[in-house]
């Protein structure tokens, strides 16, 4: 349920 490249610790 998260877009590719999504990280809860790094949002770019």
UniProtKB/Swiss-Prot annotation:
A molecular function (GO) term: toxin activity
Subcellular location: Secreted
Gene Ontology CC: extracellular region
UniProt keywords, alphabetically: Bradykinin receptor impairing toxin, G-protein coupled receptor impairing toxin, Hypotensive agent, Secreted, Toxin, Vasoactive, Vasodilator
Keyword Metal-binding tagged: no
A Gene Ontology biological process term: vasodilation
Tissue-specific expression: Expressed by the venom gland.
Major localization class: secreted
Keyword field contains Secreted: yes
Coiled-coil ranges (or none): none
Purpose: Bradykinins are a potent but short-lived agent of arteriolar dilation and increased capillary permeability. May target bradykinin receptors (BDKRB). May cause hypotension.
Protein family membership: Belongs to the bradykinin-related peptide family.
Protein name: Vespakinin-X
Organism of provenance: Vespa xanthoptera
